Each structure stands twice: as structure tokens, then as C-alpha cells.
Regions:
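Compact, glycine-rich, soluble single-domain proteins
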Residues: 48-62
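Fold-independent oxyanion-binding glycine-rich loops
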Residues: 39, 47, 60, 120-122, ...
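Short beta-strand scaffold segments in enzyme catalytic cores
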Residues: 31-38
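Short acidic, glycine/proline-rich loop/turn micro-motifs
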Residues: 46-49, 91
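C-terminal binding/interaction regions
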Residues: 2-27, 66, 71-145
Length: 145
């Protein structure tokens, strides 16, 4: 992973994701917020949609991507980030950057193979490319694994 440091635009994107989950947090239901910046500069946010049946849940990144397509058209994903809101009883109450799960890595790559992803990296988040986070991606119909 390249682990490039965040610039001001990246920090603003993290702040947008934090604001989204801070406004919509519901313990056991909405715990993750995401924000993406389209290639034309728009910032779109989303929060996860949890469900009693876990496999029915939808990640915050997927919600943000769906909103971006609906509201902005397919402009591509310049950068995306997800953050997790702590539960009330947790010692650390900071809203922290989290890595996208495997399914989210797949969908981010599917919608923009050149997307930048803000990920945890020790004390400070860093930027990686989706290709770095999902090497050797399977491409349907290519015979490639």
C-alpha cells in the first residue's frame, strides 16, 4: 500500500463521513458512515442500513455509491472513506476511519478501478488505491481470477 498522506480535500471527506454518522447514529442500527467525492468534485454521503437478518444489511459505502449514481449520474469515484461510530459503552469515543470490507472493495473497484480509498494507517489515516486493496480482482467473463 502506498499510504499517501491526506490532503485538505481528503480531510474534508473524512469530516463529511463523520458528520453523516454523527447525525444518523442509532446504536445497533447505524454505526458506519461513508463519504465519497465524485470525479467532478461532488461529495455524497451514506450510512449503513442494518437488519435483523445480517445478510440483508447494506454497507455505508454501497449506500453512498448508490446515492452518487442516483443524484450525480455515473461520475466515477475519486475518493471514498468509511468511519465507525463507537457504541455508548466503548472507552474510545472517537469516530475512526475503517477499512472497507471485502464486498465494498469489490463494488468500489467495479464502479471505479482508479478510486482512491482512505484507510486506517496507525495514528493517521492514509490513502491507498482500490487496486492496492484488492489485488488480482476477479473480472467476470475474463477467465481471470
Amino acid at each position: 500500500m502506498s499510504g499517501a498522506p491526506l490532503d485538505d480535500k481528503d480531510r474534508a471527506l473524512v469530516a463529511a463521513a463523520r458528520d453523516a454518522i454523527r447525525q444518523r447514529y442509532r446504536n445497533e442500527w447505524q454505526e458506519v458512515g461513508a463519504a465519497l467525492r465524485t470525479r467532478d468534485g461532488r461529495i455524497i454521503t451514506g450510512v449503513n442500513i442494518d437488519a435483523y437478518l445480517g445478510r440483508m444489511a447494506v454497507c455505508a459505502e454501497a449506500v453512498a455509491i448508490g446515492r452518487a449514481i442516483t443524484e450525480a449520474g455515473d461520475q466515477g469515484i475519486d475518493t471514498i472513506v468509511a468511519v465507525r461510530h463507537p457504541k455508548p459503552g466503548e472507552t474510545d469515543q472517537s469516530i475512526a476511519v475503517v477499512s472497507p470490507c471485502g464486498s465494498c472493495r469489490e463494488i468500489i473497484y467495479d464502479y471505479d478501478a482508479k478510486a482512491r480509498v482512505i484507510v486506517p494507517n496507525g495514528d493517521e489515516p492514509a490513502v491507498a488505491t482500490i487496486a492496492e486493496l484488492l489485488p488480482n480482482k476477479y473480472v467476470r467473463g475474463s477467465g481471470r481470477w
